[in-house]
């Protein structure tokens, strides 16, 4: 069996056609590569999502924090950890709320899923985790997929994975909030979703004046 790197155009999760590199060995490996490409967003959309969480301003997004569950000591610790995460991500959430990019609503839904988590153990186990850009992209892709896939790894820091095991209604609500990138054949470009100023009609002088 050959193990050559092959580049080919492939349809991505966002509906865009992107050049992908396929390098897995054998026919089953090639199939796995194709399925992975189909289950992830294109490079341009990945960069769009990353830009959305970069350089937040000084704003803050109000979040209703649920009561944490666990032993008293764990709850106290988890509260501090969750508050630290909120201070870090709150300004980003405020920025997302103001953005017309359809991906912004999906990213905001991801963060809101995160802060709905009530398990003290989750916050403690992930106390060193930064919920960075790569995490955001993975979470948005989880929301966008019509069904689970075995070609993408799961991890314990995922809010999507947590709620898939605890309460699917939370995921359903997040998908509804992110419908602009889910219920579409192709995700619109960021510029296409931005409101444009109405054009003023050019009026010729009236002959009656």
Functional labels for PLM-detected ranges:
Residues 1-11, 66:
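Short acidic, Pro/Gly- and aromatic-enriched capping/linker segments at domain boundaries
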Residues 8-13, 40-43:
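Cys/His-enriched microdomains
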Residues 13, 17, 45-48:
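Cys/His-rich metal-chelating microdomains
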Residues 23-209:
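Charged, low-complexity intrinsically disordered segments and flexible loops
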Residues 1, 14, 198-200:
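Intrinsically disordered, low-complexity regions enriched for glutamine and histidine
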């Amino acid at each position: 069996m050959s193990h050559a790197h092959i580049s080919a155009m492939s349809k991505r999760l966002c509906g865009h056609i992107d050049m992908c590199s396929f390098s897995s060995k054998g026919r089953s490996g090639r199939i796995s590569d194709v399925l992975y490409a189909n289950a992830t967003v294109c490079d341009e959309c990945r960069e769009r999502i990353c830009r959305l969480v970069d350089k937040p301003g000084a704003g803050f997004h109000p979040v209703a924090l649920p009561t944490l569950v666990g032993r008293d000591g764990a709850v106290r610790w988890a509260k501090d950890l969750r508050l630290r995460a909120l201070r870090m991500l709150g300004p980003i959430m405020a920025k997302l709320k103001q953005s017309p990019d359809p991906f912004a609503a999906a990213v905001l839904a991801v963060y809101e899923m995160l802060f709905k988590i009530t398990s003290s153990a989750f916050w403690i186990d992930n106390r060193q985790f930064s919920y960075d850009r790569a995490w955001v992209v993975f979470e948005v892709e989880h929301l966008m997929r019509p069904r689970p896939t075995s070609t993408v790894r799961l991890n314990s820091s995922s809010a999507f994975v947590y709620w898939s095991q605890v309460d699917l209604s939370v995921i359903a609500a997040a998908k509804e909030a992110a419908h602009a990138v889910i219920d579409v054949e192709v995700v619109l470009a960021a510029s296409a979703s931005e409101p444009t100023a109405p054009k003023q009609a050019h009026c010729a002088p009236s002959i009656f004046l």
